[in-house]
Amino acid sequence: THSVVSGPDQNGKIIVYNSGTQGVRDEEEMEECIGNIPGDNRTALFRIDVIEIPVAEPSKSRIVSSPTVFADPETGALGGLWAGGDHGDDTQETRRTDQCHDITVFPSKGLAAGACSGNGILFDISDPYNPQRIDVVTDIGFAYWHSATFNNEGTKVIFTDEWGGGGRARCRAWDSLDWGANAIYDIVDNKSEFRSHYKMPAPQ
């Protein structure tokens, strides 16, 4: 994802949030690319990038910070959210939360919603340079949190599951109707309150 969060400001700069969902490049290819090495907090995982882009000179764009938005607030552990795996008997296996596939912003309300592999996340972006995680949701029927969409008023958010991936979609007649769907939440006092699921009943 790469979402324009604010701007251009009086200095002609815009702010973009970026997160990739591919594997981390080898350190031999790019020195600052460090994968999932236990105990190494320099990893490119478990964070998003805040990018500042001068509209008049985009070649001078730069990453201004890479906040660890999935960290445990008490221990500081980078992987503080869903660790991956299923949720118990007859539940979906959900990917680990270490990247965001989609971050959608609602600047006038100072909110962003992230579909972040293993969780749906609500962010306070009133300071665009310093996004803060304010709520997290899980779903035992989701495999990979794929997209987040606000309604026009910014009072609801729909999270969509990518069950099986684009090339292995599992919406066949024999697949479980309880797995993979749209999950609809109301935003109440900056918290996500689950309301319902929606899934197309017709198999592909």
PLM regions: where:
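Feature marking well-ordered beta-strand scaffolds used for ligand recognition
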Residues: 1-204
